[in-house]
Amino acid sequence: MTESRWYSTSPPAKLNLFLELLARRDDGFHELDTVMVAIDWRDELHVRRTTNPGVQLSVDWTDGRTSVAAELQVDEDNELLLVPTDDKNLVVRALNRLTETLRLDGGWEVQLNKNIPSGAGMGGASSDAASALQLGWAAARETQSDLPETLKNETLLSLAAEIGSDVPFFLGDLQADRLVQCAHATGRGEKLNFFTLANPLHAVVIYPAASVSTAQVYSRCQVPDSPQSSNELLRALQGIAAESEFSLHNALQAPARGLSSRIDPALECLSKAGLTHCHMTGSGSACFALADSSQQAAIAAETLRSTFPGGALIRPVMSCVVPSEIHIA
């Protein structure tokens, strides 16, 4: 085989606008009712096929490790900045599984530039994995022209669900071949009903220099007797009901607050900044609040950078489409 060109994209993060536990499954997971929106806090991923077997992954921080460490007020070797380059990284796992499934020769060279923090509940690792599958498929098609394009959707969706519950969301609506920003997810998060937002969503996100274990958060959860429903939120986001009628919810927020003392200050500061619907995303520790406009979000984020107690990554964000555009060099 010959080496392919470089394929690149910008994997986005996500926010859980709603997350409720419906039941505990026999496989250890929970049945969920969750609403996810992709946001423009992005990593950068570059992939190409090589003649050398395996996945050679290089990782760096886009803004530089020194700069990010200064924002977080931690040392440069702090675990918050450490990103694995072996099969603990979902990018490596995704490309290895793609190689096995398609029976490809050779391997992969990958450059991952991080912006999305780990242990934040923002789906950064899952988004990177989904993008790796998309880029890997495109690169494989370049060097193996007999690879049927008709197998793409089935293959990528199957591998994505195998790699992680959030990974299929970041592939977007492959079946309908359309760009979307939002999805209502059920099952363990892999059963997706995609939709387009009636209006762009603006928010401010705080990652309060703390990583929270997803497994520990879920282990402290209890399934409510009367779960809340996402129906009103879904209607509002799609423009079917007035936006003033919706409320956000995260069943994981209370147990996560018990695991990290950094979550409460983030929620409190977001509320004091004049933003609305302050909540944690996913299993934490990142928290967010909604803004009326990109200008309000930018002003609030700037204020929070000077008032938040301790280190944090604070960003104004807005909704974006999935999947991200692929570039070839």
From Swiss-Prot:
Its EC number is 2.7.1.148. The keyword Manganese does not apply. The active site is at 14, 166. It catalyses: 4-CDP-2-C-methyl-D-erythritol + ATP = 4-CDP-2-C-methyl-D-erythritol 2-phosphate + ADP + H(+). Keywords: ATP-binding, Isoprene biosynthesis, Kinase, Nucleotide-binding, Transferase. The gene is ispE. GO terms for biological process: isopentenyl diphosphate biosynthetic process, methylerythritol 4-phosphate pathway; terpenoid biosynthetic process. It comes from the Bacteria. It comes from Rhodopirellula baltica (strain DSM 10527 / NCIMB 13988 / SH1). Catalyzes the phosphorylation of the position 2 hydroxy group of 4-diphosphocytidyl-2C-methyl-D-erythritol. It is an enzyme of class 2 (transferase). Pathway: Isoprenoid biosynthesis; isopentenyl diphosphate biosynthesis via DXP pathway; isopentenyl diphosphate from 1-deoxy-D-xylulose 5-phosphate: step 3/6. GO terms for molecular function: 4-(cytidine 5'-diphospho)-2-C-methyl-D-erythritol kinase activity; ATP binding. NCBIfam families: ispE. This is 4-diphosphocytidyl-2-C-methyl-D-erythritol kinase. The lineage of its organism: Bacteria, Pseudomonadati, Planctomycetota, Planctomycetia, Pirellulales. Belongs to the GHMP kinase family. IspE subfamily. ATP binds at residues 117-127. InterPro entries: GHMP_kinase_C_dom, GHMP_kinase_C_sf, GHMP_kinase_N_dom, IspE, Ribosomal_Su5_D2-typ_SF, Ribsml_uS5_D2-typ_fold_subgr.
